[in-house]
Design a protein with these regions (language model features):
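Extended, folded cores of ATP/NTP-driven motor/assembly subunits in large transport
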Residues: 1-216
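Glycine-rich phosphate-binding loop of nucleotide-binding enzymes
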Residues: 218-220
Length: 220
């Protein structure tokens, strides 16, 4: 009689239970997935979009230009700034002076000549103020992140914020097809992914006036 072949059974060794890992700060604040669309993105359970300031008023008497945005729910203002060196400061002023002098001598457009003359007066006033107050020039970029529960609320909030910016003579870029870069720029742990594209060179006093805090302008 043929002997029965006994099958060897491999005993499964129970896997050791992995110890729970303590989450760090980035794991706690970062969402698991972000879906980017043309003019907004979905982050967790909220709809969001990022705007970038691209134009600023030449002069204003208003203080704390963005203070109304700082008081709104669902609005986050992120400001990047870096100081210019002495050589860079001289180069910026020299280039602005030469450009406006060239435009002032234009005979084809009266509007261009008048605008250049006004710009030269602004440059002269800026130099006088910098000399009097020992005020440096600063590269500044401002990104505004909006957050809402649904797309309709996000559109309403964006229209409201845009109206506030226009009232303060500020222009914003909606960053169409660039919301991913906007998300990285407005993130607390992010960076200015646009580089110098939305940077403007402003006096230190004007940069301080962008922070959403109302102040008297005096040290006391």
């Amino acid at each position: 009689m043929a002997k029965k072949v006994q099958k060897k059974t491999n005993k499964k060794v129970p896997a050791k239970a992995s110890e729970p890992r303590v989450k760090d700060f980035l794991d706690l604040i970062a969402p698991t997935a972000v879906k980017f669309n043309t003019d907004h993105y979905v982050c967790g359970g909220t709809y969001r979009c990022t705007l970038a300031l691209r134009s600023y008023p030449a002069s204003t008497e208003e203080l704390a230009l963005l203070r109304r945005l700082g008081e709104k729910s669902g609005v986050t203002v992120h400001i990047y700034n870096r100081r210019t060196s002495a050589a860079e400061e001289d180069k910026i002023i020299h280039n602005a002076e030469n450009k406006n002098k060239l435009d002032r001598g234009s005979t084809s457009s009266m509007k261009q000549a008048v605008t250049a003359e006004a710009n030269l007066q602004d440059v002269a006033a800026l130099i006088a103020s910098m000399r009097k107050n020992s005020e440096p020039l600063i590269h500044c970029a401002v990104f505004i992140e909006l957050s809402a529960r649904d797309p309709d609320s996000l559109r309403a909030l964006r229209d409201e914020v845009t109206s506030e910016l226009i009232r303060s003579k500020l222009g914003a870029d909606r960053l169409l097809l660039r919301q991913r870069e906007g998300f990285l720029s407005s993130n607390p742990a992010g960076r200015n992914t646009f580089g110098s594209q939305f940077e403007r060179v402003l006096p230190a006093k004007s940069v301080a006036n962008l922070y959403p805090f109302n102040y008297s302008g005096k040290t006391d």
